Amino acid sequence: MFSTDLTNKILFEPLQSGMDELSILSAYATPNMLSWYIKNLFHKTASPIKINLIVGMVPFDNLSVSVHEGFQQIVSSDLPHEVSAVQCSYVIDKPAEHSNLFIWSRQGQPQTAFSGSANFVQSSFVGNHRRELMMQCDPAEASEYYD
């Protein structure tokens, strides 16, 4: 269990082990965080990664047009060579999904995963805006839950 250095432990260190796909299930997520992450991948990976994002609380809190358009713009934009593809989808049927999972895979096989309170938003990963608690979890179980 850990509450410090989440950005490196969850978003960047797994890249050093040759991971090529990050699947994120987040209760809340923003295009700003996705854009920040893509920009900060610069020179941090030897081969391009695929990013899959599912935003879970849409049935409960809805999603603004500007947030949806922000995700659309990122998904359809020219990506840097560090990113092979970005997919973004939303849970639209109830019940809403309040879980937060970050699953790293290599060649389609889940290798490491994290769960906890950190949403995929900048206030969880950038700066010291609030405390978050995350833990490693079983990657196969996390992947099964994600799917």
Residue ranges and their predicted role:
Residues M1-D147:
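PLD/PLD-like phosphodiesterase catalytic module centered on the HKD motif
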